[in-house]
């Protein structure tokens, strides 16, 4: 059942974290058993679909650049850095990386398993504006910005994650 919040009451740490990840107490209960909830499984499938479209977009750039080079539409300049060849190489590498990430996420979805890690959470510094990460027991996890802001750094948490991609699916403070 969805988390219901009294608008006048302050949020507990658990409630803040659950809201930041879009999960419920039932999700956390299943995570504690080492399983993904149906809602978490659905979210991972949506993430994989988004990665698929990203891979197609980057692959299209690679194919377009290769076509331009083959047909002579794309002129190879004297400077390698100004050349479409460098764009082709970057696009191909990005496509391979996206395909690998997509396949890793499929392994996590098919397994449906969740691992847990108990320990103090620290912020990774410096943070870039487009990615946020935390470290617990020398293991780094990328998290959404809203989840990053929900942590109280230095305190102990249980982090639930899928093992292959290290994607965080649930977090709760240790009491």
Where are these regions (language model features)?
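Beta-strand/loop nucleic-acid-binding surfaces
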Residues: 139-151
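Cytosolic juxtamembrane N-terminal segments of multi-pass membrane proteins
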Residues: 2-52
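Structural detector for short beta-strands of small beta-barrel domains
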Residues: 107-128, 158
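A membrane-cytosol interface segment of integral membrane proteins
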Residues: 149-175
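Cysteine-centric segments in proteins
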Residues: 20-34, 102-109, 148-153, 174-175
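Short acidic/glycine-enriched loop/turn segments that link adjacent beta-strands
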Residues: 128-130, 165
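Alpha-helical transmembrane spans
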Residues: 40-111
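Short, acidic/hydrophobic/Gly-rich beta-strand patch recurrent on exposed beta strands
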Residues: 131-138
């Amino acid at each position: 059942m969805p988390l219901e919040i009294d608008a006048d009451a302050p949020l507990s740490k658990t409630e803040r974290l659950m809201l930041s990840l879009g999960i419920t107490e039932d999700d956390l209960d299943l995570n504690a058993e080492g399983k993904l909830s149906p809602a978490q499984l659905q979210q991972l499938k949506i993430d994989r679909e988004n990665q698929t479209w990203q891979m197609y977009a980057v692959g299209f750039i690679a194919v377009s650049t290769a076509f331009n080079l083959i047909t002579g539409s794309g002129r190879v300049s004297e400077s390698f850095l100004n050349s479409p060849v460098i764009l082709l190489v970057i696009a191909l590498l990005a496509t391979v990386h996206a395909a690998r990430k997509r396949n890793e996420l499929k392994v996590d979805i098919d397994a449906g398993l969740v691992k847990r890690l108990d320990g103090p959470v620290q912020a990774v510094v410096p943070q870039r504006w487009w990615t946020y990460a935390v470290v617990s027991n020398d293991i780094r996890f990328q998290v959404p910005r809203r989840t990053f802001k929900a942590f109280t750094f230095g305190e102990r948490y249980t982090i639930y994650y899928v093992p292959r991609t290290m994607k965080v699916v649930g977090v709760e403070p240790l009491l």
